[in-house]
Structures are given as structure tokens and as C-alpha cells.
């Protein structure tokens, strides 16, 4: 039991560092999201509508009332695509990944939201410029 308590003390002492997204990383992520949207043949407004429908369906499936602010606005979709968001919102980034299913440049599979964050902050192995040529 003392090992558990020691571990807990160590965890409480750790400090979380902020993640720093780079302009290059946000731009790369934006290009991946835009390419995925264009492959689907959706406009930015259609993408907004699909994210609203997707998130509303999640609430209905869980048996919860659907809030009025579900989905991602077309302005936010546009800012993501241009790499112009100063901070990335986990909810909206996850929705975009689940709805658009951009291709992960490392795995070749659908991009997971966590890996999208790695792209935005140029974390290895997502910092290799050859992946984005």
C-alpha cells in the first residue's frame, strides 16, 4: 500500500506543461482537414451541418437532451482549415476528425484527435516534412 501512496504523491507533484502549437503544425493540420472535406465533396457550410447532426445524434443515443450549441460553426471550420486558431478545442477537433476522417500521414488510417494534436505541435513523428509533400 505504501507504494501506491508514494506514486500518488509523485503524481500530485508533477506540473502539467502547456502544449505549444506551431504555425507550421496548425497549417499542416488545416490542410489535412481541408483535403478530407474536399474529398467528401462538402462545402464548409455542409461540414457545419454534418457536425451538428453527428453531435446531436450522440446526445440522442445517450438519452440526453440536445443542447442548442451542438456542432461546429462554419467560421470555426474555416479557421481550422486556414490554421488560424490560436488554441485548438478538443471537442471541435474530435468532431472534425470523426466526421471528416482525414488520413493520418504516419499510419495511413483515419486521423485520431490525439494525433491531430501531435501534428499541430509538430511532435515526432509528425514533424517530418516529407510526410506533407
Regions found by a protein language model. Name each.
Residues 43, 54, 73-76, 89, ...:
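Short coil turns linking two alpha-helices in DNA-binding domains
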Residues 36, 50, 80, 119-120:
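Residues in the recognition helix of alpha-helical DNA-binding motifs
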Residues 67-98:
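Short, basic-rich loop-to-helix N-cap that marks the start of a DNA-contacting helix
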Residues 53-75:
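Short, positively charged loop/turn segments that connect secondary-structure elements
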Amino acid at each position: 500500500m505504501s507504494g501506491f501512496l508514494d506514486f500518488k504523491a509523485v503524481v500530485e507533484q508533477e506540473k502539467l506543461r502547456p502544449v505549444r502549437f506551431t504555425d507550421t503544425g496548425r497549417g499542416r493540420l488545416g490542410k489535412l482537414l481541408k483535403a478530407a472535406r474536399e474529398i467528401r465533396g462538402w462545402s464548409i457550410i455542409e461540414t457545419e451541418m454534418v457536425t451538428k447532426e453527428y453531435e446531436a445524434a450522440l446526445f440522442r443515443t445517450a438519452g440526453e437532451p440536445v443542447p442548442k450549441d451542438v456542432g461546429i460553426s462554419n467560421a470555426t471550420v474555416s479557421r481550422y482549415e486556414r490554421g488560424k486558431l490560436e488554441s485548438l478545442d478538443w471537442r471541435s477537433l474530435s468532431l472534425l476528425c470523426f466526421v471528416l476522417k482525414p488520413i493520418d500521414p504516419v499510419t495511413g488510417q483515419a486521423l485520431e484527435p490525439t494525433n491531430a494534436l501531435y501534428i499541430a505541435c509538430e511532435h515526432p513523428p509528425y514533424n517530418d516534412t516529407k510526410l506533407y509533400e
